[in-house]
Regions:
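Helix-coil boundary and N-terminal low-complexity module in membrane systems
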Residues: 1-153, 181, 186-227, 236-239, ...
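Loop-to-helix entry region at the N-terminal start of transmembrane alpha-helices
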Residues: 87-94, 162-173
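Membrane-interfacial helix-loop-helix connectors in multipass membrane proteins
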Residues: 155-168, 232-239
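Histidine/lysine/aspartate-rich catalytic loop segments that bind and position anionic ligands
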Residues: 165-187
């Protein structure tokens, strides 16, 4: 039986091979820490599963109500009342389950912060540390967002003839989602309370607004696509699970890379020089 030979690299790894920009760092992390990102995705799936199941059963009920309406078992008034009640109760349940989803997001935030900062990671220890540090802020941000999303749905459903839901959703996409994403990362990096994080996120959003807006539009595009598939609840649930495991960690990592670039430019260089360029290779003459 032949002995397996260990393959060695043709040359030693040099510090100069480390990424020098946040863009390079993103692909460096994806290539070398994919297993960590995958494990993060599995935790996100586990804690987001109640939300996924809520959407699944909502879609099932919507299909059932529509079939009764088409068959004549339910008149238009009862159909609209049932759909509105389903929307209200579904939104309330989603708000409640954000407390579960916050557990994974808080822990994963710590993991991603460490990856981008170039810090060593012990996954479970860092995950627990992230939950301890970030859970309250993550809960509050998701709670506020869920309330605002529920209000948008309410306005869209009850004032549909005035098209008031459209400006509400536009405001959510243009301002609320980008600011809340930035606030989540700001609170994780600088370990401040959520209100301080939101205040600073509002100030920092506009210099880099187009990048965060693109990230927000990405979320909006996914939700819009899933909305058009709501007549296929099982397919929607499977897609959501795949998104949680494979896409969401990559998305959040990209968000961290963009945010660290912003922090380096507008905060770290002057106020937190010890954080400036963390995780990147910098020649000695630049460090001095």
């Amino acid at each position: 039986m032949k002995k397996r030979k260990n393959k060695a690299a043709s040359s030693d790894f040099l510090p100069t091979q480390l990424p020098q920009t946040r863009k390079d760092q993103y692909f460096f992390i994806v290539k070398n820490q994919f297993s960590t990102l995958l494990l993060s995705g599995l935790w996100l799936l586990l804690c987001c599963l109640p939300l996924i199941l809520t959407v699944y059963f909502q879609n099932q009920f919507e299909i059932g109500f529509y079939q009764k309406y088409v068959s004549g078992e339910m008149n238009k008034t009862d159909y609209q009342a049932s759909m509105n009640a389903l929307m209200i109760y579904g939104s309330i349940i989603e708000v409640a389950f954000t407390f579960v989803a916050s557990f994974a997001i808080a822990g994963v935030n710590r993991i991603l912060k460490s990856l981008v900062s170039g810090e060593p990671i012990l996954f479970w220890d860092d995950f627990k540390c992230g939950v301890k540090q970030n859970y309250l802020n993550t809960c509050l941000l998701l709670f506020f967002f869920s309330i605002l999303l529920g209000l948008c749905r309410f306005v869209n459903a009850f004032f549909i003839e005035y098209l008031l839901g459209i400006p509400c959703y536009i405001l959510l996409i243009l301002i609320v989602i980008p600011v809340f994403m930035l606030a989540s990362i700001f609170s994780s990096v600088y370990e401040c309370n959520v209100f301080h994080a939101i205040s600073n996120a509002v100030k920092l959003y506009f210099p880099f607004w187009w990048k965060y807006l693109l990230m927000s539009l990405g979320i909006a595009a996914i939700f819009t696509g899933l909305h058009y598939l709501e007549t296929l609840p099982f397919i929607v649930a499977i897609v959501q699970m795949v998104l949680c495991v494979l896409i969401l960690p990559l998305y959040l990592l990209l968000l961290y890379s963009i945010s660290f670039s912003l922090f380096d430019k507008y905060i770290n260089q002057e106020e937190f020089p010890e954080f400036y360029g963390s995780g990147l290779y910098r020649p000695k003459e630049e460090e001095k």
